[in-house]
């Protein structure tokens, strides 16, 4: 089965379970916490993703992880289901999809803002305010850094890309210059 479909199915199942308990926000925190713990610990990540390690050992790892952090029964059962079905390798994707489902249910638009340098809190607030004014909707902004854009920002949401970066401007100029045919120009007499 396609990875995106699997991810969507698991995220929807987790969301529906959380919704029935009215714990959607708590589950988002938990799935992000568990994901970051697993992603940050390479040994645990490899162990849980390995087809060689038996499921009993994987369950033991999850149980010891759960002892150290307080997570709900829904999240514990979900992690055990992922182990049972050998799907722990898609946990990070499930967390991202779950996050999108939660924000969609609250009518909050997820927006990615890329800048060359880390934006100051006042700059982040200014960007958020102006994006929300443009979209006429509450947003959840994910700020990212990409030095290759040189300056300015790039805004992404849904299938929209707004490029206000120096690199984007230079690319447009380069493309325009490439389309100009120098041989068609006639010298002025």
Swiss-Prot record:
Its record classes its membrane topology as: Peripheral membrane protein
**MF term (GO), any:** proton-transporting ATP synthase activity, rotational mechanism
- What's any one GO cellular component for it? proton-transporting ATP synthase complex
* UniProt-listed Pfam families: OSCP
Which Gene3D superfamilies does the record associate with it? N-terminal domain of the delta subunit of the F1F0-ATP synthase
Subunit relationships: F-type ATPases have 2 components, F(1) - the catalytic core - and F(0) - the membrane proton channel. F(1) has five subunits: alpha(3), beta(3), gamma(1), delta(1), epsilon(1). F(0) has three main subunits: a(1), b(2) and c(10-14). The alpha and beta chains form an alternating ring which encloses part of the gamma chain. F(1) is attached to F(0) by a central stalk formed by the gamma and epsilon chains, while a peripheral stalk is formed by the delta and b chains.
Q: Which family does it belong to?
A: Belongs to the ATPase delta chain family.
Name of the protein in question: ATP synthase subunit delta
């Amino acid at each position: 089965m396609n990875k995106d479909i699997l991810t969507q199915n698991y995220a929807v199942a987790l969301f529906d379970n959380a919704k029935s308990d009215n714990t959607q926000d708590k589950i988002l925190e938990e799935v992000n916490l568990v994901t970051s713990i697993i992603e940050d610990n390479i040994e645990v990540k490899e162990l849980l993703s390995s087809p060689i390690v038996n499921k009993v050992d994987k369950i033991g790892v999850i149980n010891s992880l759960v002892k150290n952090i307080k997570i709900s029964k829904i999240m514990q059962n979900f992690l055990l289901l992922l182990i049972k079905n050998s799907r722990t390798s898609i946990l990070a994707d499930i967390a991202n999809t779950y996050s999108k489902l939660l924000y969609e249910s609250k009518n909050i638009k997820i927006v990615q803002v890329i800048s060359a340098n880390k934006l100051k809190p006042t700059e982040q607030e200014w960007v958020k305010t102006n994006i929300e004014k443009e979209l006429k909707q509450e947003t959840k902004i994910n700020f990212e850094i990409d030095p290759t854009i040189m300056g300015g920002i790039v805004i992404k949401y849904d299938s929209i890309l707004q490029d206000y970066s120096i690199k984007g401007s230079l690319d447009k100029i380069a493309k325009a210059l490439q389309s100009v045919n120098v041989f068609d120009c006639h010298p002025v007499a």
